[in-house]
């Protein structure tokens, strides 16, 4: 898997480099229809009536400064092709790349998801002047909302399906001594429950949130690992995905706090514990506490997104040095370094899933445990009052008995 991924990245960079060179040496550009098509036809007719003038203009434009044009084109080709490959690798889109030989130099078959999930009706005039209607690829639109699945959405569907199959297959194999896949799944589930949920939320309330934490851990883990598979895509490198994962944690955290302290206690917490006698300070504490609600999901979003994007950019940058410096000797150092970063990314996939789950449980536990501590303090207060009353009554009895003894 590692070698195949690195070879795929290297081939994509080389093909992009070749495309850049082809563009520099006069590759024909695709024709694009514009509203000024009639003017173009008239200009073409004029050029046909005066071929010498058109040829002279073309020759002057083509041979104006060939050395300067070649140098600028080469530099722009290198920069644009390498940068485009790096952005294309992490960007979302409608085109899904599947393994297979589809002709030409490409080792991947490109499937346009707009052709699969949606069509668009277009009316046009044929060569005989008749109005015809045909179907072309277009977005899947409901009202004004584009609902066409992108490749990152497809990756999430595939990850969810594989996750369900793996978990159900592991759970069905019930035995006293777990082995193989069931042992591995059970180990991870027990780790999430005992080492993450219980330690951060507490034994009393942990099991209520374990299903979400386990689901988030495995879902993020599978998406991270998918990004290291050739022809796949890293959905967690899309900030829209990480935002929604953080939103789920945010909503569950608010639900846990309202369930623990009630609606009144939830809004009372916005004052930051400042008593009513110091109510002018509420104008400072309430905005601070309100912003604090959103800094936690923001941290979850940026942490996961930035780490996944950075790892892929480092690998692509190391492989891109071969083509940027135009020397095969660079591969002696860049390929082993890229391979080591790739192996590190396997570890990072688990680490980022763990960090997201751990921080989510920490945020949930901060609102649940705070309520538990308040109840505990109240119980201790009542106990201390009862104990103090008992000691007081005992002291009064002793004091009352003293004169008798005297």
UniProtKB/Swiss-Prot annotation:
Keywords: ATP synthesis, Cell inner membrane, Cell membrane, CF(0), Hydrogen ion transport, Ion transport, Membrane, Transmembrane, Transmembrane helix, Transport
The family this protein is said to belong to: Belongs to the ATPase A chain family.
GO terms, molecular function: proton-transporting ATP synthase activity, rotational mechanism
Biased composition (Low complexity): 22-31, 43-59, 383-406
Region spans: Disordered: 22-76, 375-406
InterPro entries: ATP_synth_F0_asu, ATP_synth_F0_asu_AS, ATP_synth_F0_asu_bact/mt, F0_ATP_A_sf
PANTHER family: ATP SYNTHASE SUBUNIT A
Function as written in the Swiss-Prot or TrEMBL entry: Key component of the proton channel; it plays a direct role in the translocation of protons across the membrane.
Quaternary context: F-type ATPases have 2 components, CF(1) - the catalytic core - and CF(0) - the membrane proton channel. CF(1) has five subunits: alpha(3), beta(3), gamma(1), delta(1), epsilon(1). CF(0) has three main subunits: a(1), b(2) and c(9-12). The alpha and beta chains form an alternating ring which encloses part of the gamma chain. CF(1) is attached to CF(0) by a central stalk formed by the gamma and epsilon chains, while a peripheral stalk is formed by the delta and b chains.
Organism field: Anaeromyxobacter sp. (strain Fw109-5)
GO cellular component, one term: plasma membrane
Transmembrane stretches, start-end: 151-171, 209-229, 232-252, 278-298, 304-324, 351-371
Upper taxonomic lineage: Bacteria, Pseudomonadati, Myxococcota, Myxococcia, Myxococcales
Main localisation: membrane
Protein name (record): ATP synthase subunit a
Membrane topology reported for the UniProt record: Multi-pass membrane protein
SUPFAM superfamilies per record: F1F0 ATP synthase subunit A
Annotated localization: Cell inner membrane
């Amino acid at each position: 898997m590692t070698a195949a991924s690195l070879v795929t990245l290297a081939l994509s960079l080389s093909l992009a480099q070749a495309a850049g060179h082809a563009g520099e040496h006069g590759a024909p550009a695709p024709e694009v229809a514009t509203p000024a098509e009639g003017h173009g036809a008239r200009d073409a007719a004029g050029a046909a009536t005066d071929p010498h003038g058109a040829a002279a203009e073309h020759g002057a434009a083509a041979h104006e400064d060939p050395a300067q044009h070649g140098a600028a084109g080469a530099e722009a080709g290198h920069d644009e092709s390498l940068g485009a490959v790096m952005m294309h690798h992490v960007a979302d889109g409608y085109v899904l790349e599947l393994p297979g030989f589809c002709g030409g130099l490409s080792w991947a078959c490109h499937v346009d998801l707009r052709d699969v999930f949606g069509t668009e009706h277009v009316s046009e005039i044929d060569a005989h002047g008749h109005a015809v209607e045909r179907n072309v690829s277009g977005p899947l639109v409901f009202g004004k909302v584009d609902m066409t699945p992108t490749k990152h959405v497809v990756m999430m569907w595939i990850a969810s399906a594989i996750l369900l199959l793996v978990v159900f297959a592991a759970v069905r194999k019930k035995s006293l001594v777990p082995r193989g896949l069931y042992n591995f799944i059970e180990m991870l589930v027990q780790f999430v429950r005992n080492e993450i949920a219980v330690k951060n939320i507490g034994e009393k309330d942990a099991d209520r949130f374990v299903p979400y934490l386990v689901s988030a851990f495995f879902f993020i883990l599978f998406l991270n690992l998918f990004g290291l598979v050739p022809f796949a895509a890293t959905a967690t490198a899309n900030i829209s995905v990480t935002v929604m994962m953080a939103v789920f944690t945010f909503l569950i955290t608010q639900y846990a706090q309202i369930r623990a302290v009630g609606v009144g206690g939830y809004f009372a917490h916005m004052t930051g514990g400042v008593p009513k006698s110091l109510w002018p300070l509420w104008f400072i504490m309430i905005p601070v506490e309100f912003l604090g609600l959103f800094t936690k999901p923001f941290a979850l979003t940026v942490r996961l997104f930035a780490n996944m994007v950075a790892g892929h950019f480092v690998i692509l940058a190391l492989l891109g040095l071969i083509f940027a410096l135009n020397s095969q000797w660079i591969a002696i150092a860049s390929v082993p370094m890229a391979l080591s970063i790739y192996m590190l990314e396997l570890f990072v996939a688990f680490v980022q899933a763990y960090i997201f789950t751990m921080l989510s449980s920490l945020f949930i536990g901060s609102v649940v445990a705070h309520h538990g501590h308040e109840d505990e303090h109240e119980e201790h207060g009542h106990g201390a009052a009862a104990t103090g009353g008992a000691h007081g009554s005992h002291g009064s009895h002793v004091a009352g008995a003293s004169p008798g003894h005297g």
